[in-house]
Amino acid sequence: MVLTGQELLEYACGQFEGGAYETALRAFVLAYARNYEREWILENIYNCYMAGNEMEFRNSYGRWDFGEKTAYEKCMLDFIPYCEGEYYIYDREIQEFRGVFSVKTVESVVRQECFKQSEFSAMAAITDWNWSKMPEILSEAEYRKVYLVCKDKNRCDSFFKIPELEKFAKNIMIFSCKEEFQQYFHENTAEYLPKQCAGEEEERQGLLEIINQEHAYRLTPEGRNTERVLLTIGIPTYERGNLLLKRLENLRQMPYDAEIEFAISKNGTALYQEEYKSVSSIPDARINYKGYDETLTAWYNCKSVMQIAAGKFVLIVSDEDDVIISALEHYLKVLSSYTDLAMVRAKTCVQYSTIDRTMYYKKGKEALLGGFLGQNYMSGAIYHREKFWKSGVDVWDEKYYEDNSFYGFYPHAWCQVLLSDMGDYLEDNVCLISEGDSAYEDMKEQYSQTGNSLAENLKWDRNIPVYATWESRIEQHKDALECIHDFAGGDKELELKMLQRMLEKTVYLMINVKDKYELNEKKELANTFVDETLLRLDAFGMGLSEKSKDGIISQLLS
């Protein structure tokens, strides 16, 4: 049986008097739709359901300041509280109720897999005014910025009145047309371009075309903006201009611009110099290139990258290795989400392939021991640039770089120690680096042909790098104990843990190459190693038991 407007109104009044406010509102709206006593019904709905919530709506709308918006009083839509998280939409212009908007529907959306995989970048969509039709898009605004091109901006803006939408609304920006959308990104080149587009296929392709145009503009000197670079991909390169060009060929495929830069510090003067010269002619403003017409040490070349970088974080990558572009979405999300990070160690295909779970270590001893002596390979290390320079690295370089063999070979590994006092440390199990083949044999041959000699740290002995010989490892271990003692600053418990870790690491490294030595050589060097360790421990007021001493020698000789 279909009730008349009068019957519905009488029913609504009875329900309201009995405290069934939700049922009453449904009946009031139905009576209004029957064109019965519309003025009286609307006035009572506003008085009974809206008046007590007006200030909350106004405050919620006022908190949204992402772009230009319609004045509150001029918004065409009002929202009548119906039940928890649900509102009747009333259109003041056409004087009709236009359905129910449910916040619960937005909150209950199951995220699409494509949205999960695109963790960081903003999205864009062309839509009409009715947010009820796009819960999947709205729900994404909890995780990322969402740019809406709305054909009816006034009505679209009105939804910002709803208090429960605040966690979504804070990331939403609305444009009245595609031209306004493009103008915003053309003028605000520090804002990150959206990478995903939603909507009808033709409209989606139209947005993608605009985004591609603006991306191309941002690769020009005129369109380049470094104000909000989140990640610098830093490449300290040495005598391998041919490899650098391959690395850039890969990197330039990425869709990022304002988020990213490529900082390159060129080192060496002998090999592949023409290839290096060609880098400056590559038409990509993301490239920040500095060439030295001299030979720097590997560490100072790395620090040169840190000096020229603009990013909040700097990813160090060898000119032998490629960045896995598809993994950058994840790492950009990580770097933008964890505000206390000082360093990230990313998983790589070879050197750090055993990182099978993500581990987060808080600033201090936890961060120190979480990554201590695990940074021998530089590719995949991500440093917070400002914290790097505040960590005291220059002081340590001046004190130990020239005269301490451990620090001289592994200053990048010691950086993790220094940064543990500056912030948190993260090991992440998403693979970011694909290691390439070693360029050593090519460099060796090229140097031989040109009459140049290899740098000391690149020379080999017994078919292994000079720094990996037992003689060198013993010297490094002795010097490492000095660095540890200095850093611990009287904290005996911390010093003991670091010394134990260092001892285990050195023994492990020596065992790896023990087949390069005759038994008599091993015996002599093993005893020298233990004696040097004992001398240092005694000097620091610590000891090594005879059982431990015999155990170490046994491992090295077995």
Feature-to-residue mapping (PLM):
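Glycine-rich, basic loop-to-helix element that forms the pyrophosphate-binding segment
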Residues: 292-309
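Acidic donor-binding segment of Leloir-type glycosyltransferases
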Residues: 250-291
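Short aromatic/hydrophobic "clamp" motif used to bind/position activated sugar donors
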Residues: 314
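C-terminal subregions of glycosyltransferases and related glycan-biosynthesis enzymes
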Residues: 2-7, 11-14, 20-37, 46, ...
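Conserved donor NDP-sugar-binding/catalytic core segment of glycosyltransferases
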Residues: 326-359
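Conserved nucleotide-sugar donor-binding catalytic segment
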Residues: 365-464
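The conserved acidic donor/metal-binding loop of glycosyltransferases
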Residues: 318-322
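Short, well-formed alpha-helical segments that are part of the catalytic scaffolds
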Residues: 240-254
